[in-house]
Curated annotation (Swiss-Prot):
<dbReference type="Pfam" id="PF02503">
    <property type="entry name" value="PP_kinase"/>
</dbReference>
<keyword id="KW-0460">Magnesium</keyword>
<dbReference type="InterPro" id="IPR003414">
    <property type="entry name" value="PP_kinase"/>
</dbReference>
<keyword id="KW-0597">Phosphoprotein</keyword>
<feature type="binding site">
    <location>
        <position position="568"/>
    </location>
    <ligand>
        <name>ATP</name>
    </ligand>
</feature>
<dbReference type="InterPro" id="IPR025200">
    <property type="entry name" value="PPK_C_dom2"/>
</dbReference>
<dbReference type="InterPro" id="IPR036830">
    <property type="entry name" value="PP_kinase_middle_dom_sf"/>
</dbReference>
<feature type="active site" description="Phosphohistidine intermediate">
    <location>
        <position position="435"/>
    </location>
</feature>
<keyword id="KW-0067">ATP-binding</keyword>
<keyword id="KW-0479">Metal-binding</keyword>
<dbReference type="Pfam" id="PF13089">
    <property type="entry name" value="PP_kinase_N"/>
</dbReference>
<dbReference type="InterPro" id="IPR025198">
    <property type="entry name" value="PPK_N_dom"/>
</dbReference>
<dbReference type="InterPro" id="IPR036832">
    <property type="entry name" value="PPK_N_dom_sf"/>
</dbReference>
<dbReference type="GO" id="GO:0005524">
    <property type="term" value="F:ATP binding"/>
</dbReference>
<dbReference type="GO" id="GO:0006799">
    <property type="term" value="P:polyphosphate biosynthetic process"/>
</dbReference>
<dbReference type="GO" id="GO:0008976">
    <property type="term" value="F:polyphosphate kinase activity"/>
</dbReference>
<feature type="binding site">
    <location>
        <position position="45"/>
    </location>
    <ligand>
        <name>ATP</name>
    </ligand>
</feature>
Length: 687
């Protein structure tokens, strides 16, 4: 089916974002160890891309080969384009690592020792390490009729070994497989006295290639090659059939490691007959094979910056600030009573959010706490505070999203711990992931000489995750505004109970009012532009894909509305097309921190409506998730959001990329004055 207006391909857009991430590794202004980290981040992103998006594309081709993508391409054509671009990206990534980053690291005394250049002393150390630390954990599998090719785990490091000779039972040995357990280190530090470098490292693959013969005694090792298989990692839970989501999910999680293969990675020097065998065993074609120079898993190199104590090769450390309104208050409740508080992470600390919950857990006046959890990590002081509150007799209700991708197991564990201390745990609404970020605290206070209940709320654009709060840009609002607090109470009521849709005063909520309000706000700007009034839309988000929103934005451009979009990742809208979108610009900011806040600005004939949200403008966020968008009404806070969240990004000429009408991005070039959104905010807020 052809589309009525132009859209860009989602998968190609995701790869485009990863190209921008990889460009950070080529930027000489980025510290060297951080450049290595960006290469690793690209690998991690590609892993998820193959596990989810490519797996889905392959499934669609199998199930409905004649179907078309939303942008009007046949599935097979789209797949071919995506594979070609992914191959180019991987090649560029490894070329950058081996020709630029590793040589630069060597100049700084950080070196990876290859097994074919070990000295006698290094060889002896490596042999001892292999025999003592690796060999006892490894299990060789010889391939014969009694030992078929094993179904190796998703993203595990494996070695295929060509053998010659007969084993103890007289069987002719041809091939063996060794899977490296995840518990084994992928990078081992060589003693400095042996290395000759300040920081010398040996990859696990180097140990294996040199000593794998120890696993196959009295056989000749003809070759040893590493490989890695990526599998479909989407979980299937039939939401119409299940009676207990947590139990169903626990039964499904182990299968994630053994889903259908979607990608094979091999070292570039792997013999072709070995590659063919691996492809056959995996059910993959030649296009699905990625030949790389060196290690097949660069994600594990992410630990190198942490192992190397070289502050001069890393981003400058910073201390996030605490707003004076909080620093000067006796308690968080006193601070919020004085007025709404806006927090801009990571420039302002996430600690006040933790302190609000910790104080609530210990405050005898607090009677109830309600909290949503999407991602929070395996070691979370926020979850500790919720459990403390439950142990202290508070009415604690936690909406835990069990289907947060790749955090399912962590969230199941937290749900069990919360229930064990008496908290009420619910899993939201089946069929609608709860992605909204909400905290509601109910406290008994004295007012006019009598006790009354007062609500306090925290709403955010990002997760309740202390670690990512230092890595992602997000806004959070603390308020005791009666209407907002009542709205949050109603949303929790919907999530935990059963009943009809409740009217909200201030919040826009998906899957009910968020999409209609966005469309309505765009149409107001269209009407104002047609009436000769000033009209403007500025929106910042991670992704823009929803067709009816894109259609409305195209119509806005045609009506003369100036539209500036700041979309970090994939954007299906084509900007700058004459007669369609010449009044629309699309920028992407890629820098030290992951741009994560969602901000919607509508000029509204001078009223300037500003909303913060956890929702991207995507089908899933607007129709298949529980999300909220909340207004920033207080004038000073509104100016802050506009200035810190939007204006600095629109003015950035160092870390910003501008989308062209063909979907490709060009880096904005600095003029006489360099403007970097993130560095400017660091300088403003942090010490």
């Amino acid at each position: 089916m052809s589309v009525r207006y132009p859209l860009l391909n989602r998968e190609l857009g995701i790869l485009g974002f990863n190209e921008r991430v990889l460009a950070q590794a080529a930027d000489p202004q980025v510290p060297l160890l951080e450049r290595l980290r960006f290469i690793c981040i690209t690998s991690s992103n590609l892993d998820e891309f193959f596990e989810v998006r490519m797996a889905g594309l392959q499934e669609q081709i199998r199930d409905n080969p004649g179907a078309m993508t939303p942008d009007g391409m046949s599935l097979q054509h789209a797949y071919d384009l995506v594979v070609e671009r992914a191959q180019r990206l991987v090649h560029r990534q490894y070329t950058m690592l081996h020709e630029t980053v590793l040589p630069a690291l060597e100049q700084e005394g950080i070196y990876f020792h290859n097994s074919d250049s070990w000295s006698d002393a290094q060889l002896e150390w490596a042999r001892r390490y292999f025999l003592d630390e690796l060999l006892p954990v490894l299990t060789p599998i010889g391939l014969d009729p009694a030992h078929p090719f094993p179904r190796v785990l998703n993203k595990s490091l494996n070695f295929v070994v060509e053998l010659e000779g007969r084993d103890a039972f007289g069987r002719q040995a041809v091939m063996g497989i060794v899977q490296a357990p995840r518990a084994l280190p992928r990078v081992v530090q060589m003693p400095q006295a042996l290395s000759g470098f300040e920081h010398g490292f040996v990859l696990l693959s180097s140990f294996m290639q040199r000593f794998v013969g120890e696993l196959f005694p009295q056989l000749v090792v003809k070759s040893c090659n590493q490989f890695r298989i990526t599998r479909n990692s989407e979980l299937f839970v039939d939401e119409d059939e299940i009676t207990n989501l947590r139990v169903a999910l626990q039964g499904e999680l182990p299968a994630r490691h053994l889903g259908n293969a979607v990608r094979l990675e091999v070292s570039a020097d792997t013999p072709q007959h070995i590659v063919r065998r691996l492809l056959e065993e995996s059910g993959l074609g030649e296009k699905d094979c990625y030949r790389v120079i060196g290690s097949v898993n660069l994600v594990r190199l992410m630990q190198i910056p942490d192992l190397v104590d070289r502050p001069d090769l890393k981003f400058t450390p910073f201390t996030a600030s605490i707003p004076p309104a909080i620093a000067n208050a006796t308690t968080m409740f006193d601070a919020i009573d004085e007025g709404d508080i806006l927090l801009h992470h990571p420039y302002e600390s996430f600690q006040p959010v933790l302190e609000l919950l910790q104080q609530a857990a210990r405050d005898p006046s607090v009677v109830a706490i309600k909290q949503t959890i999407y991602r929070t990590g395996t070691d979370s002081p926020l979850m500790d505070a919720l459990m403390e509150a439950a142990r202290n007799g508070k009415e604690v209700t936690v909406v835990v999203e069990l289907l947060a991708r790749f955090d399912e197991e962590t969230n199941i564990n937290w749900a069990s711990q919360l229930e064990a201390v008496g908290a009420h745990v619910v899993y939201g609404v089946v069929g609608h992931k709860c992605h909204a970020k909400m905290m509601l605290i109910v406290r008994r206070v004295m007012q006019g000489g009598k006790a009354t209940l007062r609500r306090y709320v925290h709403l955010g654009t990002g997760n309740y995750h202390p670690r990512t709060a230092r890595l992602y840009t997000d806004f959070g609002l603390m308020t005791a505004d009666q209407k907002i607090c009542e709205d949050v109470h109603h949303v929790f009521q919907q999530l935990t109970g059963i009943g009809g849709e409740l009217a909200l005063h201030e919040l826009w909520q998906s899957p009910f009012t968020l999409h209609p309000r966005i469309i309505e706000s765009i149409r107001t700007e269209i009407d104002n532009a047609r009436a000769g009034k000033r009209a403007r839309i500025v929106a910042k988000m991670n992704a823009l894909l929803e067709p009816s929103v894109i259609a409305a934005l195209y119509e806005a451009s045609q009506a003369g509305v100036k539209v500036d979009l700041i979309v970090r990742g994939v954007c299906a809208l084509k900007p700058g097309v004459p007669g369609l979108s010449e009044n629309i610009t699309v920028r992407s900011i890629v820098g030290r921190f992951l741009e994560h806040h969602r901000i919607y600005y509508f000029h509204a004939d001078g009223a300037e409506h500003v909303y913060l949200s956890s929702a991207d403008w995507m089908d899933r966020n607007l129709f298949r998730r529980v999300e909220v968008a909340f207004p920033i009404r207080e004038r000073k806070l509104k100016r802050r959001v506009i200035a810190e969240g939007l204006s600095v990004c629109l003015g950035d000429n160092q870390s910003a990329w501008q989308m062209q009408s063909d979907g490709h991005y060009r880096r904005r070039r600095a003029g006489k004055t360099v403007r970097n959104a993130q560095l400017g905010l660091l300088a403003k807020f942090c010490s």
